[in-house]
Amino acid sequence: MARIAGVNIPTNKRVVIALQYIHGIGPKFAREIVTKVGIADDRRVNQLSDAEVLQIREAIDADYQVEGDLRREVSMNIKRLMDLGCYRGLRHRRSLPVRGQRTHTNARTRKGPAKAIAGKKK
Protein backbone atom coordinates (compact mmCIF):
# COMPACT_ATOMS: atom_id res chain seq x y z
CA MET A 1 0.00 0.00 0.00
CA ALA A 2 1.44 3.36 -1.06
CA ARG A 3 1.48 6.15 1.50
CA ILE A 4 1.13 9.68 0.13
CA ALA A 5 0.52 12.80 2.26
CA GLY A 6 -0.01 10.65 5.34
CA VAL A 7 -2.80 8.60 3.71
CA ASN A 8 -2.66 4.96 2.71
CA ILE A 9 -4.05 4.94 -0.82
CA PRO A 10 -5.57 1.71 -2.20
CA THR A 11 -3.21 -0.28 -4.42
CA ASN A 12 -5.71 -1.97 -6.74
CA LYS A 13 -7.32 1.27 -8.01
CA ARG A 14 -6.22 3.55 -10.85
CA VAL A 15 -3.85 6.32 -9.76
CA VAL A 16 -6.33 9.13 -10.58
CA ILE A 17 -9.01 7.50 -8.41
CA ALA A 18 -6.63 6.55 -5.59
CA LEU A 19 -5.27 10.10 -5.25
CA GLN A 20 -8.81 11.30 -4.47
CA TYR A 21 -8.62 9.47 -1.13
CA ILE A 22 -6.41 12.36 0.03
CA HIS A 23 -8.39 15.24 1.57
CA GLY A 24 -8.06 18.26 -0.72
CA ILE A 25 -7.48 16.36 -3.97
CA GLY A 26 -10.49 15.88 -6.21
CA PRO A 27 -10.84 14.63 -9.79
CA LYS A 28 -9.40 17.80 -11.37
CA PHE A 29 -6.29 18.01 -9.18
CA ALA A 30 -5.71 14.23 -9.42
CA ARG A 31 -5.65 14.41 -13.23
CA GLU A 32 -3.42 17.50 -13.05
CA ILE A 33 -0.91 15.72 -10.79
CA VAL A 34 -0.82 12.59 -12.97
CA THR A 35 -0.20 14.58 -16.17
CA LYS A 36 2.45 16.74 -14.44
CA VAL A 37 4.35 13.64 -13.29
CA GLY A 38 3.84 11.93 -16.67
CA ILE A 39 1.96 8.80 -15.64
CA ALA A 40 -0.64 7.21 -17.94
CA ASP A 41 -4.29 7.52 -16.83
CA ASP A 42 -4.94 3.77 -16.90
CA ARG A 43 -2.02 2.80 -14.62
CA ARG A 44 -2.85 1.30 -11.25
CA VAL A 45 -1.10 2.14 -7.99
CA ASN A 46 0.44 -1.33 -7.62
CA GLN A 47 2.10 -0.88 -11.06
CA LEU A 48 3.93 2.29 -9.97
CA SER A 49 7.61 2.21 -9.12
CA ASP A 50 8.96 3.75 -5.92
CA ALA A 51 10.44 6.61 -7.96
CA GLU A 52 7.02 7.43 -9.48
CA VAL A 53 5.36 7.39 -6.06
CA LEU A 54 8.10 9.73 -4.82
CA GLN A 55 7.48 12.06 -7.79
CA ILE A 56 3.75 12.15 -6.98
CA ARG A 57 4.54 12.84 -3.32
CA GLU A 58 6.89 15.70 -4.23
CA ALA A 59 4.37 17.21 -6.70
CA ILE A 60 1.65 17.22 -4.04
CA ASP A 61 3.95 18.69 -1.37
CA ALA A 62 5.16 21.44 -3.71
CA ASP A 63 1.87 22.66 -5.19
CA TYR A 64 -1.11 21.61 -3.06
CA GLN A 65 -2.36 22.10 0.46
CA VAL A 66 -3.81 18.78 1.65
CA GLU A 67 -4.97 16.89 4.73
CA GLY A 68 -4.15 18.53 8.08
CA ASP A 69 -2.88 21.83 6.66
CA LEU A 70 -6.03 22.29 4.59
CA ARG A 71 -8.34 21.37 7.48
CA ARG A 72 -6.46 23.78 9.76
CA GLU A 73 -6.71 26.62 7.23
CA VAL A 74 -10.47 26.12 6.74
CA SER A 75 -11.11 26.07 10.49
CA MET A 76 -8.93 29.16 10.97
CA ASN A 77 -10.89 30.98 8.24
CA ILE A 78 -14.17 30.16 10.01
CA LYS A 79 -12.71 31.20 13.37
CA ARG A 80 -11.54 34.50 11.83
CA LEU A 81 -15.07 35.21 10.55
CA MET A 82 -16.49 34.46 14.00
CA ASP A 83 -13.95 36.75 15.71
CA LEU A 84 -14.69 39.58 13.28
CA GLY A 85 -18.36 39.45 14.18
CA CYS A 86 -19.47 39.73 10.56
CA TYR A 87 -22.77 38.23 9.39
CA ARG A 88 -21.19 35.00 8.17
CA GLY A 89 -19.32 34.65 11.46
CA LEU A 90 -22.52 35.12 13.46
CA ARG A 91 -24.27 32.46 11.37
CA HIS A 92 -21.38 30.04 12.01
CA ARG A 93 -21.46 30.82 15.73
CA ARG A 94 -25.21 30.10 15.94
CA SER A 95 -24.92 26.94 13.81
CA LEU A 96 -27.27 28.29 11.17
CA PRO A 97 -26.95 28.20 7.37
CA VAL A 98 -24.41 30.76 6.18
CA ARG A 99 -25.33 31.22 2.53
CA GLY A 100 -28.84 32.63 2.70
CA GLN A 101 -30.96 29.48 2.79
CA ARG A 102 -34.37 29.61 4.43
CA THR A 103 -34.54 28.46 8.06
CA HIS A 104 -38.24 28.72 8.93
CA THR A 105 -39.06 25.18 7.80
CA ASN A 106 -35.79 23.63 6.63
CA ALA A 107 -32.11 23.59 7.67
CA ARG A 108 -32.54 20.61 10.02
CA THR A 109 -29.10 19.26 9.16
CA ARG A 110 -27.37 22.45 10.23
CA LYS A 111 -29.62 23.21 13.22
CA GLY A 112 -29.70 19.67 14.63
CA PRO A 113 -32.73 17.64 15.71
CA ALA A 114 -35.99 19.49 16.37
CA LYS A 115 -36.41 20.68 19.94
CA ALA A 116 -39.77 20.13 21.65
CA ILE A 117 -41.57 23.30 22.69
CA ALA A 118 -43.89 23.16 25.73
CA GLY A 119 -47.52 24.04 25.08
CA LYS A 120 -47.50 23.09 21.39
CA LYS A 121 -49.92 20.12 21.70
CA LYS A 122 -53.28 20.17 19.91
Swiss-Prot record:
Q: What does this protein do?
A: Located at the top of the head of the 30S subunit, it contacts several helices of the 16S rRNA. In the 70S ribosome it contacts the 23S rRNA (bridge B1a) and protein L5 of the 50S subunit (bridge B1b), connecting the 2 subunits; these bridges are implicated in subunit movement. Contacts the tRNAs in the A and P-sites.
Instruction: Locate the region Disordered.
Output: 97-122
Ordered alphabetically, the record's keywords are: Ribonucleoprotein, Ribosomal protein, RNA-binding, rRNA-binding, tRNA-binding
Q: Which organism is it from?
A: Brucella anthropi (strain ATCC 49188 / DSM 6882 / CCUG 24695 / JCM 21032 / LMG 3331 / NBRC 15819 / NCTC 12168 / Alc 37)
Q: How does it assemble?
A: Part of the 30S ribosomal subunit. Forms a loose heterodimer with protein S19. Forms two bridges to the 50S subunit in the 70S ribosome.
Family in the record = Belongs to the universal ribosomal protein uS13 family.
Gene Ontology cellular component terms for the protein in this record: cytosol; small ribosomal subunit
The record, for PROSITE patterns, names: RIBOSOMAL_S13_1, RIBOSOMAL_S13_2
GO MF, one term, reads: rRNA binding
User: Do you know which InterPro entries this protein is assigned to?
Assistant: Rbsml_uS13_C, Ribosomal_uS13, Ribosomal_uS13-like_H2TH, Ribosomal_uS13_bac-type, Ribosomal_uS13_CS
Top-level taxon of the source organism: Bacteria
Please report a single Pfam family linked to this protein: Ribosomal_S13
Any keyword Nucleus? no
Q: Does the keyword Ribonucleoprotein apply?
A: yes
- As recorded in Swiss-Prot or TrEMBL, the protein's gene is named rpsM
Which Gene Ontology BP annotations are present?
A: translation
Q: Which SUPFAM superfamilies match?
A: S13-like H2TH domain (SSF46946)
Recorded protein name is Small ribosomal subunit protein uS13
